Design a protein with these regions (language model features):
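C-terminal extensions
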Residues: 1-29, 33-87
Length: 87
C-alpha cells in the first residue's frame, strides 16, 4: 500500500506531523478526497509539510501516491500551502 512507500519520502526536510494536527489538504487545488487519504497514509498531514516540498520530494510523493509524473509540481502544491500558512 501507500504507507509502505513513506520510507522513500524525505521527512527530515518536510518535518513530521500526526493525524491530530492535520489540515484540510483538499483546500489545495489538485488535492481531492482520494489523494488526501493517500497523503495522510504517507504521513503528510499539514500545509507546513507540503510547503517544504522540494522538486525531489514532489517527485517522491508523485511516485508514492501513483500520480502522473510532474503533477504535484504543476499544481504548485508547495506554493499554495505556503499561501495558506501566511493567510
Amino acid at each position: 500500500g501507500v504507507a509502505a512507500k513513506a520510507d522513500s519520502i524525505d521527512f527530515a526536510t518536510l518535518g513530521v506531523a500526526t493525524a491530530s494536527e492535520k489540515d484540510d489538504l483538499q483546500t489545495i487545488k489538485g488535492i481531492g478526497p482520494f489523494i488526501e487519504e493517500k497523503l495522510y497514509a504517507l504521513g503528510i498531514y499539514t500545509f507546513s509539510q507540503i510547503s517544504k516540498m522540494t522538486p525531489e520530494i514532489e517527485e517522491e510523493v508523485n511516485v508514492a501516491i501513483e500520480f502522473f509524473p510532474g503533477r504535484v509540481k504543476r499544481d504548485e502544491w508547495a506554493r499554495q500551502a505556503s499561501e495558506f500558512l501566511q493567510a
